[in-house]
Amino acid sequence: MWQAISQQLSDTLLFEYQITEKVRLSGGDISESYMINDGEQRYFVKINDREFLHKFEVEAESLHLLRETSTIFVPEVVLVGKTKNNAFIILNYLPTKPLDDPENSFKFGQQLAQLHQWGEQKEFGFDTDNYLGSTLQPNQWHKKWCMFFAEQRIGWQLQLLKEKGVTLVDIDDFIDVVKQLLANHTPEPSLLHGDLWNGNVALTAFGPICFDPACYWGDRECDIAMTELFGGFQPEFYQGYESVMPLLPGYHERKDIYNLYHILNHCNLFGGHYLEQAQLTINKIISY
C-alpha cells in the first residue's frame, strides 16, 4: 500500500518521493491518519477502505472551496487516490496545538464570520451530497431554509435511525414541528464548515486552522451552534465572531434545533447515551 501511495505522490509532485518516516497520528474515529516524511517534506495522510474514495473526494471538494474563500485557513489538498484495497487523501502537513489562547480565538471568530459573509447564493444546499463523519449528508438545493433543514437534516437522520430499529418520535409530525419553528426565520445562505467542533480546529504557526469540513450553504447559526454543543471554544471566539456578524434574536432557541442534527448523527454513528440526549432535545423542541 505505502509503495503505491509513494508512487502516486511522486507522480503528482513530478519528483520521486521516497517515504523514510511514517508516524501514526492519534485522533479520528473513522480513518487512520499518518505523517509521512522523505527527509525534506512532510505530508498528512488519511487512509480508509477503498469504498471510502468518494468520501475523500467530496472532502477535497469542500477543502478546495474553503481555500478559495481566503477567509478561514484549511489544509491544502495534494492528492486523493486509491490502492488495491484502500483509499487515501494527502494534505500538506502542519504541526498543530490546541486553539485555546484569547488572541487567536478572537481571530478565528472573525475569520469564520468572514466565511459566512463570503459569496452569494440564493438557495440552501450544495452541488454534491457529502458526509458528516461517515454519514451521507444530502444537499439537494431548496429555496426555503425551514424546509431544507427539517427534511434534509432532521428528517434524514431520524429516518436513518428508524432503519436501524430506533424510533424517537413520529418523523412526519416532528418534521412539521421543525418547519413551523423555523418558518419565520429567513436567513441568507452562508457557506458553512458544517462540522465545527473543537476537534476540527487547531492552531498552527500561521494562525488558526480547521479541517474535516462537511460544507453546504445554510444558516450561519448552525456553525456557531455546533461550537457550543461539545464546548472547547474560548469566549473570545464568540466576541470575535460578533464583532463582524452579531447573532440574531432567537438564536438560543434555534440552537437546540440545529444541534439536534449533530446529536442524531452521533446516535447513528455511536448510539449509547446520545439516544437519551436526542430524546431529551426532541422533547424540549416540541415544548417550544
From Swiss-Prot:
One of its GO terms (molecular function) is kinase activity. It comes from the Bacteria. InterPro entries: Fructo-/Ketosamine-3-kinase, Kinase-like_dom_sf. It holds the Pfam family Fructosamin_kin. Transmembrane segments: none annotated. Its EC number is 2.7.1.-. Belongs to the fructosamine kinase family. This is Probable ketoamine kinase VP1481.
